[in-house]
């Protein structure tokens, strides 16, 4: 009984089946190795025993034919094709044997597969044809072979990223491939999913010859102002990347708009200044670009150059601002306007008296004989200030002289002047001495809203939207602020607001100034002049509101964190695989308040408590 109860292991069991499965896996592995290594004899013997091995796939869906292509085994490929291998079978990524051969740049294998009936119009899971992959290879023959088999629709086929073979040729910096595709009918006006044309990618590659090839196409000039998803044109990309030679190449096209605006109203000059590309800044200025255009933050290119600390760009932009001529308003006469002096009001009064006497003298010359010299104190005052007013007593346009009549009181006391009808409207302002731009340091980034010169007529108009021509350094402003106590002690008719910066002459009062103060019994209202703010961030006013200049004594100032915008959001991979592709070039970071959260602002505010004291 005990013998019958013993278990019999001689019969086949599950272990024997598993052992058989493992042996089959080992056989397939040997087949794949023989195909990739070119072992024709071993591969032939195995396939003769079981022809179904030709259709077997590994974990990635690759057949023995694909392994032979990966190993660049031409004889093995021919053998497998003769034995009946499926030439158009796709792997797990949708790639055929021809697609793999093209990715590898294997010209002999591609020719062999095409001659044996391989289809060149089967896209992979990324939507790319073998023609897309051929643009990455420096050998032109591979692309030429595929173009001979392709029609127009296949040449302009767009992958899942919306990129055509022409896009990829420009992306891979292949001028000859680009020229060949254009000759075969590639459309340069097609855009990818980011609204980029092939010219955008050519500009990013930094190859001027490649850009000129696309622009020489009959449709090239029509795409020069195409903007991508962020509103950037080819000029924006060239300026941000520092390709000044490409900027000149693009500017040769008459349709090129050098002052195109992106979604944040930034010009190419804004991006060049923010990126610190001095050569591009100089090139754009030489091409006549306006340096005073503002973006949505009311910031000029000079403001971004100051903010980012690019001194070379600051010098170029500040020189451009200083060399701009001050143009009078259209209503003014064409005669050059005279500068407003401190004694301009008194000068207009006395000059009017002189002109009236000159006109009367011209009408009646005989009056000169019997006329006695006027020894009044008014004439003494005229003589005293002749040396000060200089040439201001020359004839001025009649519409610029205030028509005010005065009553003269003849008494032994000192004479004074009173307005008869209305107060005298002062047209000038005390002189504001322009200073050079402040030095750029890491801890002191000044912003200036604008450096455009404004005439005195413009200062008398309603709300100001532009700052003064230049801006004092912080040390000099502190020095002037310490003198405000002395200013309040002076009985000065030109009393200014605490935010206004005057020249050094305002702080010293002579005897002639005191005499002038006694003469002006009715003081005209003072007009305020906004001073460029010393801000460490770019102010972004809400939409629909005018830009207002902030006082230097503002209590709360928030620093904006830097943000970066990727210039090439395409997948980065070797042989154009499914992994995301990255580019080396990133556009400069210009802070924008559109994407900043409140938490980020509060954290930046707490990290920089000293900025609130400014």
Curated annotation (Swiss-Prot):
Stretches of Basic and acidic residues bias are at 354-373
Note whether Phosphoprotein occurs among the keywords: yes
Q: Where is this region: Disordered?
A: 1-20, 319-339, 354-375, 454-476, 564-614
Q: Does the keyword Repeat apply?
A: yes
Q: What InterPro entries does the record tag this protein with?
A: Ankyrin_rpt, Ankyrin_rpt-contain_sf
The annotated regions of Polar residues compositional bias extend over 7-16
Assigned keywords, A-Z: ANK repeat, Phosphoprotein, Repeat
What SUPFAM superfamilies has UniProt attached to this entry? Ankyrin repeat (SSF48403)
Q: Which SMART domains match?
A: ANK (SM00248)
Q: Modified residue Phosphoserine is at which positions? A: 475
Q: Where are the ANK repeats?
A: 26-55, 60-89, 93-125, 126-157, 161-190, 194-223, 230-260, 264-293, 297-326
- What is the designated name of this protein? Ankyrin repeat domain-containing protein 55
Species the sequence originates in = Homo sapiens (Human)
The organism's taxonomy opens as: Eukaryota, Metazoa, Chordata, Craniata, Vertebrata
């Amino acid at each position: 009984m005990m013998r019958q109860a013993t278990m019999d292991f001689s019969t086949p069991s599950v272990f024997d089946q598993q052992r058989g499965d493992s042996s089959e896996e080992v056989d397939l592995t040997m087949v794949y190795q023989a195909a990739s290594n070119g072992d024709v004899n071993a591969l032939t013997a195995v396939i003769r025993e079981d022809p179904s091995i030709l259709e077997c796939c590994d974990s990635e869906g690759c057949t023995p034919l694909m392994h032979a292509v990966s190993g660049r085994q031409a004889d093995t490929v021919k053998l497998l094709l003769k034995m009946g291998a499926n030439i158009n079978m796709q792997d797990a990524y949708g790639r055929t044997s021809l697609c793999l051969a093209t990715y590898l740049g294997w010209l002999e294998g591609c020719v062999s597969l095409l001659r044996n009936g391989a289809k060149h119009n089967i896209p992979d899971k990324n939507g790319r044809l073998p023609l897309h992959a051929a643009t990455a290879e420096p050998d032109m023959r591979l692309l030429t072979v595929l173009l001979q088999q392709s029609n127009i629709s296949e040449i302009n086929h767009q992958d899942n990223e919306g990129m055509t073979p022409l896009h990829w040729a420009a992306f891979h910096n292949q001028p000859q491939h680009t020229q060949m595709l254009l000759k075969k009918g590639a459309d340069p006006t097609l855009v990818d999913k980011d609204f980029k044309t092939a010219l955008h990618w050519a500009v990013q590659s930094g190859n001027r010859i490649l850009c000129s090839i696309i622009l020489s196409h009959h449709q090239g000039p029509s795409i020069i102002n195409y903007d991508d998803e962020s509103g950037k044109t080819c000029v924006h990309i060239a300026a941000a990347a520092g390709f000044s030679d490409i900027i000149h190449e693009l500017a040769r096209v008459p349709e090129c708009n050098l002052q195109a605006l992106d979604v944040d109203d930034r010009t190419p000059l804004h991006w060049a200044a923010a990126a610190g590309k001095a050569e591009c800044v100089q090139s754009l200025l030489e091409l006549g670009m306006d340096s005073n255009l503002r973006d949505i933050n009311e910031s000029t290119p000079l403001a971004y150059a100051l903010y980012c600390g690019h001194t070379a760009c600051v010098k170029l932009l500040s020189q451009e601002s200083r060399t701009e001529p001050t143009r009078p308003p259209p209503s003014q006469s064409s005669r050059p306007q005279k500068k407003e002096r401190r004694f301009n009001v008194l000068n207009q009064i006395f000059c009017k008296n002189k002109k009236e006497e000159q006109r009367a003298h011209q009408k009646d010359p005989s009056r000169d004989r019997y006329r006695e010299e006027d020894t009044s104190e008014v004439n003494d005052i005229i003589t005293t200030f002749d040396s000060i007013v200089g040439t201001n007593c020359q004839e001025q346009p009649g519409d610029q002289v205030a028509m005010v009549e005065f009553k003269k009181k003849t008494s032994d006391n000192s004479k004074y002047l009173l307005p008869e009808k209305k107060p005298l409207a002062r047209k000038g302002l005390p002189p504001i001495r322009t200073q050079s731009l402040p030095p750029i340091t890491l801890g002191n980034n000044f912003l200036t809203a604008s450096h455009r010169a404004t005439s005195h007529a413009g200062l008398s108009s309603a709300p100001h939207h532009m700052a003064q021509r230049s801006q004092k350094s912080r040390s000099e402003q502190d020095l002037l602020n310490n003198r405000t106590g002395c200013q309040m002690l002076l009985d000065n008719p030109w009393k200014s607001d605490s935010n206004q910066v005057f020249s050094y002459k305002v702080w010293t009062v002579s005897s002639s100034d005191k005499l002038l103060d006694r003469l002006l019994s009715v003081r005209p209202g003072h007009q305020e002049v906004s001073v460029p703010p010393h801000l460490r961030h770019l102010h972004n006013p809400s939409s629909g509101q005018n830009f207002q200049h902030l006082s230097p004594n503002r209590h709360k100032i928030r620093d904006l964190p830097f943000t970066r915008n990727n210039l090439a959001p395409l997948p980065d991979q070797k042989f154009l695989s499914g992994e995301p592709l990255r580019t080396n070039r990133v556009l400069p970071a210009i802070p924008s308040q559109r994407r900043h959260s409140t938490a980020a602002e509060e954290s930046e505010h707490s990290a920089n408590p000293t900025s609130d004291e400014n």
